[in-house]
Regions:
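Divalent metal-coordination and catalytic microenvironments
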Residues: 57, 86, 133, 171
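Carboxylate-rich, divalent-cation-coordinating active-site regions
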Residues: 91-123
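Acidic/histidine-rich, surface-exposed loop or edge segments in extracytoplasmic proteins
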Residues: 34-53, 130
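Surface-exposed patches in mature extracellular/periplasmic domains of secreted proteins
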Residues: 74-81, 158-163
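Active-site/substrate-binding loop(s) of hydrolase catalytic cores
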Residues: 107, 117-131, 139-212
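Active-site-proximal beta-strand/loop segments in catalytic clefts of secreted hydrolases
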Residues: 80-81, 92-95, 131-134, 172-176
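Soluble secreted/lumenal catalytic domains
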Residues: 21-30, 61-69, 76-79, 85-87, ...
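Bacterial Sec-dependent N-terminal signal peptides
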Residues: 1-23
Length: 212
């Protein structure tokens, strides 16, 4: 019985430790961390907590993306509209500084190639669209978007530099701002200090139909 009690208490300790150990070392290798530009703000320095400690709220997500765009020559940001609840729908364009300076020409070339007015060339950067968290109850996308955007903005790794030289990434950190905000509020106000996987827990039983 004593051994069972010990194992029970140890499991809570390990779960609690796992929640607290959410620094950049948890998400990135030491080599990745070494390559990061210290002039680019990390998510934690802006949102006030490590990524994963709390579900990101949409207002903090937007605040961080705007901070990245202000701090990095690789990123521009635009507001494309508003949601039903008047939250901004934002889109980041992430690419190399050189491509940013020629972004209008790159866009024109892609349109002309699509319309058959220009022969496709291998040196033309690819355009990739990445969107996160279409459903409010699928928050991992928008939470991971914090880390991915930071890495693309801050990394001086050779692979990342080559990627951004050859690619223009259209980056939508939240398809569904209203759903993300609703779920983040519910989960953050009802979660336990220690992780609880019991499906009967209040954290997992929202007052609206799940998913959206």
């Amino acid at each position: 019985m004593k051994n069972l009690i010990y194992l029970y208490l140890l499991s809570f300790t390990l779960i609690s430790f796992g929640q607290e150990n959410l620094s950049l070392n948890y998400y990135f290798s030491q080599q990745d961390i070494t390559s990061l530009n210290k002039e680019i703000p990390s998510p934690e320095s802006v949102i006030g907590h490590p990524v994963g400690k709390w579900h990101i709220s949409h207002d903090k997500l937007v605040e961080y993306m705007r901070k990245l765009a202000f701090s990095s020559e690789r990123i521009t940001i635009e507001e494309r509209g508003k949601t039903f609840e008047d939250r901004p729908l934002i889109l980041l364009t992430i690419t190399s500084e050189k491509n940013q300076k020629n972004i209008n020409q790159i866009q024109k070339n892609h349109i002309d190639q699509t319309n058959g007015l220009l022969t496709p060339k291998t040196e033309t950067p690819l355009v990739v669209y990445q969107g996160f968290s279409i459903h409010g109850n699928e928050p991992s996308g928008s939470n991971s978007a914090l880390l991915l955007a930071y890495y693309l903005a801050a990394s001086n790794d050779k692979f990342v530099n080559e990627l951004l030289s050859n690619t223009v990434i259209l980056f939508d950190p939240s398809f569904n701002p209203d759903g993300l905000q609703r779920f983040a509020y519910w989960a953050n106000t009802n979660k336990n200090i220690n992780l609880n996987q019991d499906s009967n827990d209040r954290e997992y039983n929202e007052v609206w139909p799940g998913g959206r």
